[in-house]
Amino acid sequence: MINGVYYNEISRDLDISSSTQCLRFLKETVIPSLANNGNNSTSIQYHGISKNDNIKKSVNKLDKQINMADRSLGLQQVVCIFSYGPHIQKMLSILEIFKKGYIKNNKKIYQWNKLTSFDIKREGRNELQEERLKVPILVTLVSDSEIIDLNLHSFTKQ
């Protein structure tokens, strides 16, 4: 039995088995704290991926998102792809297929990754033993140009 889901050592009211609820939490709470867009000079498109997503539809959606026409407003276009736990493998497959198709068209792509985690506390065999698990969260930012307006100090450039 799970006693609680924690992020940054703060208890969150999340059901870790509900991908919709967790992906919404990542989009609304976790990602804004990681990629600070303080001056709003970057247009960020979000794409949460679960293991049930269709690869072809997701790749097409990513392609549309990265080519959006917000540049006319002087905004830099960034796509934020994110997932957690058992969904990360599907996310990586979709991301690599998307990048392969994008680079195939002689376009350059820039990528930044951030790995963080949820902490889960489970009941042990007795009340004195508590089991702690980490559920990984992967956040990836991709753009067709260098990201200069986001605070990416915690991200690793790919």
From Swiss-Prot:
UniProt-listed GO biological process terms: intronic box C/D snoRNA processing; maturation of 5.8S rRNA; nuclear-transcribed mRNA catabolic process, RNase MRP-dependent; rRNA processing; tRNA 5'-leader removal; tRNA processing
Subcellular location: Nucleus
Catalyzed reactions: Endonucleolytic cleavage of RNA, removing 5'-extranucleotides from tRNA precursor
Pfam family, one: Alba
Coiled-coil stretches: 51-71
Alphabetically ordered keywords of this record: Coiled coil, Hydrolase, Nucleus, rRNA processing, tRNA processing
Major localization listed first in the record, in broad terms: nucleus
Cross-referenced InterPro entries: DNA/RNA-bd_Alba-like (IPR002775)
EC number: 3.1.26.5
Gene Ontology molecular function terms on file: ribonuclease P activity; RNA binding; rRNA primary transcript binding
Main EC class the enzyme belongs to: hydrolase
GO cellular-component term (any): nucleus
Domain of life, per lineage: Eukaryota
Cited function: Component of ribonuclease P, a protein complex that generates mature tRNA molecules by cleaving their 5'-ends. Also a component of RNase MRP, which cleaves pre-rRNA sequences.
Description of how the protein assembles with itself and partners: Component of nuclear RNase P and RNase MRP complexes. RNase P consists of an RNA moiety and at least 9 protein subunits including POP1, POP3, POP4, POP5, POP6, POP7, POP8, RPP1 and RPR2. RNase MRP complex consists of an RNA moiety and at least 10 protein subunits including POP1, POP3, POP4, POP5, POP6, POP7, POP8, RMP1, RPP1 and SNM1, many of which are shared with the RNase P complex.
Miscellaneous note of the record: Present with 3180 molecules/cell in log phase SD medium.
Identification of the protein by name: Ribonucleases P/MRP protein subunit POP6
Organism: Saccharomyces cerevisiae (strain ATCC 204508 / S288c)
Gene that produces this protein: POP6
